[in-house]
A protein has these predicted regions:
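A catalytic-pocket lid/entrance helix-loop region that shapes and gates access to the active site
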Residues: 13-78, 128-159
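Conserved alpha/beta-hydrolase "acid-adjacent" motif
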Residues: 257-262
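Glycine-rich nucleophile elbow surrounding the catalytic serine of serine-hydrolase chemistry
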Residues: 3-13
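Alpha/beta-hydrolase fold active-site neighborhood
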Residues: 80-242
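Short glycine-rich catalytic loops that host catalytic nucleophiles or stabilize transition states
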Residues: 277-283
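Short beta-strand/loop motif that positions the catalytic acidic residue
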Residues: 243-244, 249-252, 256
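Catalytic histidine-centered segment of alpha/beta-hydrolase-like enzymes
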Residues: 283-293
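Loop/turn elements at helix/coil->beta-strand transitions in domains of secreted/extracellular proteins
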Residues: 20-23, 245-247, 272-275
Length: 293
């Protein structure tokens, strides 16, 4: 069995329910199953999993890698200042990059998170795209943007970035509710009070500016959701299924913006035959999905 992200949670549960059906497991960039189900825990799901902290750390690592590359990363001299400038400007105004699109704070953060998540999974360097976008937005903010050039499909800031923002269509909204929100709300224990999201979001935003509000809001739809497992007595934890008895391998990237580097070590402890491998120069969410190996 191979599972990535939430698929790894499914694999961890399945292996405990039906151990005779599996020879081995590979769990790639797994969410922590204990935190995912969260039986009896007072915080919302994404506060328990911690992607706000991991996302900020990955962005910091990206800036450091660019600076370490020197002249090989054309944005190295100004990238941190550019980012801070963009964040500050977006507090009060919308920024438009000619040939690319218009960004408010929410659209920009969605694009940042999406680029860190994907890495190079779409056949181009998402991180180079992101750095170029940050610099372009900073130029717009301070009025030094060059004259616009026609956008092309292979431009550094092009079609891929434009796809990262904007309101979802009705069909896409319904699809997300059925394939993401319904699963999350049915699986995870969530607090019954909506104030729990406000408090968790404020705390996460204070620790990881730009990422806290984004991530904690992702499961706020579960508050009041009729199928939500929001009663402690109805919540199931991964420990209720026993241990993983088959051999299993846990993979993680050192620069994973969703589960972090140390998630693999936690998941390895779910059974006596687990091993963890961390790719020290691995980026994005998913080791095998983005790997050329």
């Amino acid at each position: 069995y191979y599972g990535i992200s939430y698929g790894a949670v499914v694999g961890a549960v399945y292996s405990r329910l039906f151990p005779a059906h599996l020879r081995s497991l590979t769990l790639d960039s797994p969410d922590d199953p204990e935190a995912w189900f969260g039986a009896g825990r007072p915080d919302p799901l994404w506060a328990r999993l911690g992607p706000a902290e991991y996302g900020e750390a990955t962005l910091e690592d990206l800036f450091s890698a660019c600076e370490s590359a020197g002249s090989r990363c054309q944005w190295a001299p100004t990238i941190r200042a550019d980012y801070e400038h963009v964040i500050e400007a977006l507090r009060t105004e919308r920024l438009t990059v000619p040939g690319t699109g218009s960004f408010d704070a929410s659209a920009f953060q969605n694009t940042v998170v999406g680029a860190l998540y994907r890495f190079n999974q779409n056949g181009r360097d998402d991180y180079e795209t992101l750095l170029g976008l940050i610099h372009a937005l900073a130029q717009v903010a301070d009025g030094t943007a060059p004259d616009a050039e026609p956008a092309s499909d292979d431009s550094v800031i092009g079609q891929q970035t434009r796809a990262g923002f904007g309101a979802l269509s009705q069909d896409a909204t319904v699809s997300r509710m059925l394939t993401v929100d319904a699963v999350v709300c049915a699986d995870a224990h969530e607090p019954p009070q909506r104030e729990a999201w406000f408090m968790s979001a404020a705390a996460a935003e204070a620790d990881s500016p730009g990422f806290g509000y984004y991530w904690i809001s992702q499961d706020s739809i579960c508050n009041g959701w009729s199928a939500a497992g929001n009663r402690v007595e109805d919540s199931v934890g991964i420990s209720d299924y026993g241990t993983i008895d088959v051999p299993f391998l846990v993979l993680s990237n050192a620069h994973d913006p969703v589960v972090g580097e140390w998630g693999a070590d936690r998941v390895k402890g779910l059974g006596p035959r687990g091993e963890a491998v961390a790719v020290t120069d691995g980026w994005g969410h998913g080791v095998l999905r983005g790997s050329s190996c």
